[in-house]
């Protein structure tokens, strides 16, 4: 029986993971679960999976969680970091944003063998520091993002003579919008993704294509491949998740339905494969289309290459991620327009002046903190409130 933990169990990926685990109780013993604020769902999940530990990040909800778990033996902590130290065979980390970095580092130190990682920000911002620590501790990182999971599976079979890797992007809900239409995008439209069911933040990132910018940086770090060998193409059907092109001209691609249960299941069971109901039928799919991204309407992609080709790629990765988290949050509150999201990110990157060597988690946190201050100032002073 595998011992597992799920950090961020009440988000979209976390809920999918819990659903899979609930159907495979004979295979997995759930040691720990964590959530930011959804104490009611966390308590339900803990009872469903017979979890030994739970953690809530919002300490104001500790009493509510405790009351919800009365009559059980579940131990309660505050903050995912406090249960990330529990050694397990596999830890699923599905916390959203930079908040996941600390817990990931703790999981690496805990003696856990495998991390199934849905938190791309950890790889984007943690970079070499995180991956070096994982290598020292002999911790395998399996990405859950469908694109990186696809590339991971292909490279597991053959990582020699790679010419390039191709990440596919759905293009989001505004793929065919004009610039004028993009200026008037409302929040509810940005949250309506055509092919994936995701949380608010990643839905907006997909709409701006900032998600793909972050994924390019993630791919560079995770697969140790140079930026000029990473390409992103638009594939609206989201059936082809990743492609690896080899020097002899052969291309290996992973095709699957748009269901996060598929990469999650692989991460849980790999290298074995567990049966799932959703199977791809290409005859019913009809056509698969591919196109170049439009950088004028979706300039976020260029920022990823600017970051990776800069003199301080890790610092700039942290700045980009922090500014984007601030800008997306302001958009979700309808304080700035859709096109202003990338503008805030770009302005923050231009305004950030102090570049330091990154030798610790504290260095990353400090850069992230300073970037957020700059991004907030840019929002307040340069961006007209959206209405």
Swiss-Prot record:
Cofactor: Mg(2+); Mn(2+)
InterPro entries tied to this protein: DXP_reductoisomerase (IPR003821), DXP_reductoisomerase_C (IPR013644), DXP_reductoisomerase_N (IPR013512), DXPR_C (IPR026877), DXPR_C_sf (IPR036169), NAD(P)-bd_dom_sf (IPR036291)
Pathway terms, separated by semicolons: Isoprenoid biosynthesis; isopentenyl diphosphate biosynthesis via DXP pathway; isopentenyl diphosphate from 1-deoxy-D-xylulose 5-phosphate: step 1/6
Binding annotation for Mn(2+): 145, 147, 215
First-tier enzyme category under EC: oxidoreductase
Catalytic reaction annotation: 2-C-methyl-D-erythritol 4-phosphate + NADP(+) = 1-deoxy-D-xylulose 5-phosphate + NADPH + H(+)
Keyword NADP: yes
Family annotation (SUPFAM superfamilies): 1-deoxy-D-xylulose-5-phosphate reductoisomerase, C-terminal domain, Glyceraldehyde-3-phosphate dehydrogenase-like, C-terminal domain, NAD(P)-binding Rossmann-fold domains
Pfam families the record matches: DXP_redisom_C (PF08436), DXP_reductoisom (PF02670), DXPR_C (PF13288)
Residues noted as binding 1-deoxy-D-xylulose 5-phosphate in the record, renumbered to the chain: 120, 146-147, 170, 193, 206, 211-212, 215
Residues reported to bind NADPH: 10-13, 38, 119, 121, 199
Family: Belongs to the DXR family.
Name of this chain's protein: 1-deoxy-D-xylulose 5-phosphate reductoisomerase
Gene, per the UniProt record: dxr
